[in-house]
């Protein structure tokens, strides 16, 4: 079987959607080796987290070929890619990040789309109006046209039915996993080297995730203010909300107790997870919450929110 993936996030994103895309490709190409896997991406970035495909003789990378498609990469990904899929004799196409291309439903290619969350509908004030309209159009259209929908949690399945009016029988819940790097014990010398490299003390709290309003990092910082000498390590990045957090840190003289990191290798992340006292994940809402899973596999306790998907990611049966 020849399986195509929308692999843009796998190449260009090192957070949630990228992790999901890479892990899906990695697991399928390893355990179902007789298939042929085609990774379609508008840009082929060298991403060390995709190093496994170099040894895979069953995995191939495809990028836009014509000058038109190279120039209008978004148009290629959302529509013109269908011709390439047909020419490559793709049997199944999997939209790994909430969408499938227009017109694919008119071909013989079977389609699967993974929907991660509908946060833009639940919390509209966190998104620009134009972005909400684009997301709604893409998500709903993709769900209606796809042969099968994967929801990453029961909460996401419920939202797809409620907000997009999609029949339940079309949706299957398949929980996300996490990279094997978090399932292996990191040697003490590697932990020590990593902590020394980033000037991290031995006793610290950990936050992992993008730095945006719904993730609620500011709540951790306000609590940190009441915990003298407690250190916090933040792995993630952001824009306006990060500036808000940085201002709070400056105003409350917390700059020597908070360390911001990004662009870490999986080995470094594993070492920091496993060395932490606990991981705090106070997000308002998620589609799943991979950092919870990464922390549990790292044998590090987690404090997270109630409701939504959090009991699925970190509950008794997680």
Predicted features, each with a name:
Residues 1-318:
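Carbohydrate transferase catalytic cores enriched for Leloir-type hexosyltransferases
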């Amino acid at each position: 079987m020849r399986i195509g993936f929308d692999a843009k996030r796998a190449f260009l994103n090192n957070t949630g959607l990228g992790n999901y895309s890479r892990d899906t490709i990695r697991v399928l190409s390893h355990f179902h080796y007789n298939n042929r896997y085609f990774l379609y991406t508008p840009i082929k970035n060298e991403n060390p987290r995709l190093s496994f495909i170099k040894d895979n003789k069953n995995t191939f990378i495809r990028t836009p070929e014509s000058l038109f498609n190279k120039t209008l990469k978004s148009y290629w990904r959302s529509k013109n890619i269908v011709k390439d899929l047909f020419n490559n004799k793709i049997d199944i196409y999997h939209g790994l990040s909430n969408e499938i291309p227009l017109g694919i439903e008119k071909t013989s290619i079977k389609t699967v789309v993974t929907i991660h969350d509908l946060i833009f509908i639940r919390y509209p004030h966190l998104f620009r109006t134009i972005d909400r309209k684009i997301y709604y159009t893409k998500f709903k259209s993709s769900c209606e046209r796809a042969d099968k929908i994967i929801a990453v949690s029961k909460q996401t399945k419920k939202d797809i039915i409620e907000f997009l009016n999609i029949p339940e029988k079309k949706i299957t819940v398949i929980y996300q996993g996490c990279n094997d790097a978090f399932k292996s014990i990191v040697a003490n010398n590697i932990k020590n080297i990593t902590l020394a490299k980033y000037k991290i003390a031995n006793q610290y709290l950990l936050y992992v995730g993008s730095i945006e309003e719904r993730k609620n990092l500011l709540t951790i910082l306000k609590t940190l203010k009441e915990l003298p000498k407690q250190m916090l390590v933040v792995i993630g990045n952001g824009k306006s909300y990060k500036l808000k957090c940085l201002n709070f840190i400056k105003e409350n003289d917390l700059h020597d107790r908070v360390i911001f990191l990004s662009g870490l290798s999986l080995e470094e992340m594993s070492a920091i997870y496993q060395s932490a006292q606990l991981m705090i994940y106070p997000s308002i809402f998620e589609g799943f919450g991979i950092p919870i899973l990464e922390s549990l596999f790292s044998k590090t306790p987690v404090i997270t929110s109630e409701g939504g998907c959090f009991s699925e990611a970190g509950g008794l049966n997680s």
